[in-house]
Amino acid sequence: MELNRECLLHFSGLIPLLTIPWLGTTWLIFTVLVALHRFRERVWQLYCQREGLAKYLAIGMVSAYFTEVLAIIDNLDKPPAERALLHPNPLTDLYLALAYYLPFVLYWGLAAKRYNYSWREVFLIGGATGILMEQSGAVFLSMNPFAWLYVLIVYGSYKALPVLAAEGCLKKKKRRELGAWKKLALGLLVEFTAFISAGALLWLFRVIA
């Protein structure tokens, strides 16, 4: 049964590739997540050779920036006012992306290091809360379940990817065990705190710019 679920996951990673003409490129980050899962044993060996927060942050920010670049590609053919980005100008958007994504990558990294979160749990919690945050709540208010699923997959993938890369090392650490409800509550706190921090950093980055 576990093998069948794993095969299903790996095959599902092909879906974003096959739907690019209709759904765009942004959710290709899910394909990257699935590919990482497929070769996770090798990735864990490389990661554990020199683990640390700096390496985790590097992987997390590469994941986040890859997602943002894909989002820019999907929005280039739209008028600037209609682009679902941090800023309609691609270069400015990439500048602001550092402020937005860093708190989510950092806080989830600290939470996963201390508590027994799996990449799947980060995927679900981070993806579900992303539905509320995307476009300042406009996606959630659209009441479109397909849009919800799309956002869940995109947000969940970029947040879970560094956790999956580090999971081989994390499992060897003495992390505090939490039950499902406590994990959910703490995960929501991580998301809320990261969202507030991202908002503050975005304001600061815009002032500096």
Please identify what each model-predicted range represents.
Residues 1-209:
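Aromatic-rich, lipid-facing transmembrane alpha helices and their immediate juxtamembrane interface loops
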